[in-house]
């Protein structure tokens, strides 16, 4: 019988079906993404979050291991509780919404995480300030790559003449 490949080796390499990556590199990638990510386990305890300076909501290491319901304000608790109940039961897999916050457009999504056998592992959340993306869409502000390069070259030439 063939030995199962380890998912993490002594060099902190993570081995996935789709390739390998060093744990410090993956952590850096996750903290480079200009959005915030978080994870609550199957017991609804807050376990992990990205820490990249692009936060809409402040997160603190002291909240790790705490029940997620206690981390939400009273008005949101019933909705969070119902969503988690649906995630646990498998009747809902995701929930997403937009919200206006201090003049910014915030996109928030929650995903139920299941293993290959359907066992509930927890809830993954994604929060992002999409204000600039929305403005780009509204103004059709798209710069074709070649035009951007030509503009940069023109700017460099004009500085060379000064």
Per-range role (PLM):
Residues 2-7, 11-12, 19, 128-162:
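Juxtadomain coupling helices with adjacent low-complexity linkers
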Residues 23-27, 33-34, 83-86, 97-101, ...:
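Intrinsically disordered, low-complexity segments enriched in polar/charged residues with Gly/Pro
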Residues 2-4, 20-27, 63-65, 77-83:
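Short low-complexity stretches enriched in small and charged residues
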Residues 5-12, 16, 22-23, 47, ...:
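Generic signal for short, ordered secondary-structure residues
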Residues 14-16, 25-26, 67-75, 144-149:
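Short, contiguous hydrophobic alpha-helices characteristic of membrane insertion segments
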């Amino acid at each position: 019988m063939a030995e199962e490949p380890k998912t993490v080796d002594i060099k902190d390499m993570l081995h996935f079906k789709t390739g390998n990556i060093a744990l410090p590199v993956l952590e850096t990638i996750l903290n480079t993404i200009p959005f915030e990510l978080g994870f609550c386990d199957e017991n609804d305890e807050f376990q992990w979050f990205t820490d990249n300076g692009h936060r809409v909501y402040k997160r603190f290491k002291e909240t790790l291991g705490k029940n997620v319901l206690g981390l939400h304000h009273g008005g949101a608790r019933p909705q969070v509780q119902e969503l988690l109940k649906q995630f646990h039961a498998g009747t809902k897999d995701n929930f997403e919404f937009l919200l206006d916050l201090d003049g910014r457009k915030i996109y928030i999504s929650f995903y139920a995480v299941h293993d290959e056998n359907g066992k509930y592992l927890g809830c993954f959340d994604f929060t992002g300030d999409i204000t600039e993306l929305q403005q780009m869409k509204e103004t059709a502000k798209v710069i074709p790559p070649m035009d951007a390069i030509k503009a940069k070259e023109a700017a460099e030439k004009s500085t060379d003449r000064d």
